[in-house]
């Protein structure tokens, strides 16, 4: 994290974890956005908190976010027309132990349920299993399987993959 790097005297550009840190920053940002109207406030909040520090980083993130939200499917997801469950835990019991999973974004509209997990790195098949797991948990909660759709949104690759 930026604070730890600062204390250790590691420049942000030299940090071995800069790609991980960037992914976490973007994940935090996208989790804070409920509708498209929230983008500027969410970025401003991260600047205020010192998570986004450099003006060029701010400009890059604003541009990446604007571009990501230009995709029609994303515009629908962030339109405000959905009942939203953002970063909400799904809790269940397995072999006598409580377990939790936290999808990035679950949306409901009419009889449709959409699970979206956003990723800021390269495609990986393990992510498909992760979203399938979220979908199975929603089925166990009583939602009809045929009403549940899952997606992986590889933000920086401009790719939405149906699971």
Label every model-predicted segment.
Residues 35, 85, 135, 142, ...:
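Amphipathic alpha-helical interaction segments
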Residues 103, 109, 113-149:
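Basic, amphipathic alpha-helical patches used to engage nucleic acids or provide basic targeting signals
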Residues 1-103, 107-112, 126-128, 153-157:
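Nuclease catalytic cores
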Residues 143-163:
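Substrate-binding beta-hairpin/strand module that engages nucleic acids
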């Amino acid at each position: 994290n930026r604070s730890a790097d600062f204390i250790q005297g590691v420049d942000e550009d030299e940090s071995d974890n800069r790609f991980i840190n960037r992914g976490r920053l973007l994940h935090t940002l996208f989790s804070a956005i409920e509708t498209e109207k929230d983008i500027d406030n969410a970025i401003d909040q991260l600047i205020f908190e010192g998570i986004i520090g450099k003006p060029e980083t701010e400009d890059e993130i604003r541009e990446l976010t604007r571009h990501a939200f230009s995709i029609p499917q994303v515009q629908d997801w962030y339109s405000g027309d959905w009942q939203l469950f953002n970063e909400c835990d799904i809790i269940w019991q397995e072999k006598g132990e409580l377990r939790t999973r936290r999808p990035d974004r679950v949306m409901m509209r009419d009889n449709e349920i959409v699970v979206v997990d956003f990723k800021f790195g390269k495609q990986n098949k393990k992510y498909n299993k992760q979203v399938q797991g979220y979908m199975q948990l929603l089925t166990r909660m009583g939602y009809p399987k045929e009403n549940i759709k899952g997606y992986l949104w590889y933000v920086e690759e401009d790719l939405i993959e149906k699971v």
